[in-house]
Amino acid sequence: MEFTDLLPCTVVERVNRFLVNVKLNDKIVEAHLHDPGRLKEIIYTGNKVLVRRKSGKKTGYRITFGLREDQYILIDSGLHSQIASHFVSQECKPEVKIDDRRLDFACNDIFIEVKGCTLSIDGVAIFPDAPTLRGYEHLRLLERLAQEGKGAYVLFLIFSDATSFRPNSETDPRFSDEFYKALKNGVKFSFKRFSFDGKYLKYSGDILTFDGDDKS
């Protein structure tokens, strides 16, 4: 995926969950942050971010990448489905409603949910970085679909150079427990890693290993 309209900024203050004041060309402007995570290791005063201009929006700018350990990480979850669409069949339908939940893709009796992972520690990708009731409910739904004989998948987009993955049992033990339960009951997980070179977000291979106890 190519990005040609990125503007470098410096974080001034995170006003709330979705609004950040940034310094752009010596002027403080408001930028929308489209990511439900805490992002404490990325969104803090003085750190570098890359934004895109968004006409017709309240803030005018949208944060797309944030710097962490000399590497820019994608932090715009609004792009996740677009990225994931390169890895699913063109026959898949997006945003499919099942009961009172929505899943990102459905291909006949195969259902796929997409999650973006920005947090990594010592080469281990960790999700989530904040408690996620929505993520937990998605896993429960996919587990039920798997037990009904349908294909149930979670596609994790890993925006770091991590070499393994684990659910974040410290931050969200409920999600972590359900992750292993869903895995045991037929939900399939895929972990695709991406890197950014300043212009292109590139697929850089799959993570094939788990870190820690698989609770099997």
From Swiss-Prot:
<dbReference type="InterPro" id="IPR005224">
    <property type="entry name" value="SfsA"/>
</dbReference>
<comment type="similarity">
    <text>Belongs to the SfsA family.</text>
</comment>
<dbReference type="InterPro" id="IPR040452">
    <property type="entry name" value="SfsA_C"/>
</dbReference>
<dbReference type="Pfam" id="PF17746">
    <property type="entry name" value="SfsA_N"/>
</dbReference>
<dbReference type="GO" id="GO:0003677">
    <property type="term" value="F:DNA binding"/>
</dbReference>
<dbReference type="InterPro" id="IPR041465">
    <property type="entry name" value="SfsA_N"/>
</dbReference>
<dbReference type="Pfam" id="PF03749">
    <property type="entry name" value="SfsA"/>
</dbReference>
<protein>
    <recommendedName>
        <fullName>Sugar fermentation stimulation protein homolog</fullName>
    </recommendedName>
</protein>
